[in-house]
């Protein structure tokens, strides 16, 4: 049976939407994927997917994006029942707290009984070749966890 992977993104500039698209392309041959903007996601339904990948930016100096706030608050009340997950996204090293939203989301997914299957990936603004390699590895780790 083909595994299902939900890719959830928050994007202000389009970077993270593009990252979500890149991940979908990496996963498409071996999994059913759905890309959804984070404000449209029901955190209580995450366990319906075999795995979840969150792609988020960090707003200002370490904040979650506004559009991710409701999702994040709901996530605090969800039992993910060992749903596999990975977190990645873009930020700016000019911020005091580079990629802190990635950290917040990773911590909350773990606290909600998720199973982290790949190291979180933080990207400084637009991805370069090394970043794409790390994203490809994240995708491969998610797929391997479902085998």
Model regions: which residues?
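FMN-binding flavodoxin-like domain, especially the glycine-rich phosphate-binding loop
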Residues: 2-5, 15-18, 26, 30, ...
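Short polar catalytic/cofactor-binding loops
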Residues: 10-14
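Short acidic active-site motifs
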Residues: 40-45
